[in-house]
């Protein structure tokens, strides 16, 4: 079982890191925010969550300063991936992130590129992905689709891009292969969810 990451203790009781990534106050923002937002609009998006597996152990072994240098290199890699595959980086919590894409194939290609690039840093990353209707306002995206994506990421293993059946259904004609990972219970989400490893 994974030891608890520092990021899971940064939020209010009952709110874990995956949920926190979906909260608007965890995205980069100016010190002063307007007291109102524009009306949200419904959009269809692919949400991609990723985080470092075993980051607490790495931090403890390396020390704060060396670990921060690794994180700087890590975030440079993921931002390059977002730029290459047209992803939008929405929020960050600890070493985890949330991004959206117009199409699942872009998100899978981005995740694969990040996995390959972080090998030089000795990092193990896991990804979770879902596609569906979201509510978008300003630079914030929310809704059940986002939370499902977060829960899928929590079920992923190191080095895995774990996706929902909805993602797989969008890619029936693509060259991307999928390995059936069976049905899963996703915390707080009704029903059983069929998940697949994209490879």
Name these PLM-found stretches:
Residues 2-42, 199:
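Intrinsically disordered or compositionally simple regulatory linkers and C-terminal tails
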Residues 13-16, 74, 163:
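Alpha-helical structural motif
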Residues 9, 31-112, 117:
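Catalytic NTP-binding/metal-coordinating core of nucleotidyl cyclase/transferase enzymes
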Residues 10-11, 27-30, 58-60, 88, ...:
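A broad, low-specificity signal for short, low-complexity segments enriched in glycine/proline
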Residues 79, 98-199:
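Catalytic beta-strand-to-alpha-helix segment of the class III nucleotidyl cyclase homology domain
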Residues 9, 20-22, 70, 122, ...:
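Acidic/proline-rich low-complexity IDRs
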């Amino acid at each position: 079982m994974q030891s608890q990451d520092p990021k899971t203790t940064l939020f209010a009781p009952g709110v874990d890191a995956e949920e926190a990534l979906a909260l608007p106050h965890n995205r980069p923002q100016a010190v002063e925010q307007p007291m109102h937002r524009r009306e949200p609009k419904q959009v269809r998006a692919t949400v991609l969550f990723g985080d470092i597996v075993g980051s607490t152990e790495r931090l403890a072994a390396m020390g704060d300063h060396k670990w921060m240098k690794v994180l700087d290199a890590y975030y440079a890699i993921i931002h390059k991936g977002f730029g290459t595959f047209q992803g939008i980086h929405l929020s960050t919590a600890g070493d985890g992130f949330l991004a959206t894409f117009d199409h699942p194939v872009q998100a899978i290609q981005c995740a694969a590129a990040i996995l390959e690039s972080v090998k030089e840093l000795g990092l193990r990353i896991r990804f979770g992905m879902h596609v569906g209707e979201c509510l978008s306002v300003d630079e914030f995206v929310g809704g059940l689709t986002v939370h499902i994506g977060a829960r899928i990421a929590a079920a992923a293993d190191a080095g895995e891009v774990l996706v929902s059946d909805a993602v797989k259904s969008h890619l029936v004609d693509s060259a991307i292969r999928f390995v059936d990972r069976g049905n899963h219970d996703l915390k707080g989400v009704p029903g059983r969810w069929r998940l697949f490893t994209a490879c």
